[in-house]
Amino acid sequence: MRQPIQTPIIGREDLGDLSRPEQALAQFYRGLNGRDLALLAENWEPSDDAAMDNPLGGIARGWPAIRALYERLFASDGRLWVEFHDYTIHGSDSLFYAVGRERGRFERSPAGLDLAIRTTRIFRRGGRRVGGRWRQVHHHGSIEDPALLGAYRQAVTPAPR
């Protein structure tokens, strides 16, 4: 059995040429923590094959639907920061999946939430790849605590203007 990696991926790691799974994961967290939709678009497969099952929006299929969820998150007046830890990476030359946990914080005045999310991400080479880079094709995240899930959903809903 593989031992989970405890050193977190936060998005500040060297992205190199994005040929290694850890680099693809770091690119994703750099885009998420930096609220960078362009970087997230580079990380995700830009086709209808992409799917995300996320605590915020049910199942989103295709990059346009996934992008809309990130736009909603980034439109809130809160700030999100997460890191990926306690993970294992499995795969082959054309596909890998990372299974682990995200921990982080969502700050929105006057309070914040500490987040704990079970996470799986799947990446592949092929399809609409560029230079052999990995593209994310699936994400599944689950918040186990129902109270935390409700508070997180409410917190990221943009305030009325």
Where are these regions (language model features)?
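A beta-strand edge to alpha-helix "cap/lid" segment located at domain peripheries
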Residues: 1-39, 51-161
